[in-house]
Amino acid sequence: MSNEIKNAQITGISISMADHNCLTFRVTVQGACWGCSIGNYKIGTGMLGADYWDASGSGVVAMMKIMDTVGSDTWEGLKGMYCRVEFTEDGTMVQKIGNLIKDKWFDIREFFKKASEATTATYVLDERPEKK
């Protein structure tokens, strides 16, 4: 069984530390008669008034990969853009976000799975093309 793919418009983007005592990002997408949010992935530790702050390299890389996949060079520029989303097999969560025209996808769930298994942020280097 293949996962369902739908066209969507990005209707909201956020970076917030309001509800989780950490900095998270979210991308909200809407299609014909449906909508959902992708994210709440941690990109940093800290909150208003905190004594300790830290950033997650993998979270920032994920944001950059979303921007690259959809085709925006700014986070704010994502809002209003069109994309494709691929849902998990059970249809309850977005597995991948894709470019509307190009066959270009970012598997956000697999990315964070690998990130949680890695001991350093060097896992992202595995995806760099070789220099000629």
What is the meaning of each model-derived region?
Residues 1-132:
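Short beta-rich binding modules
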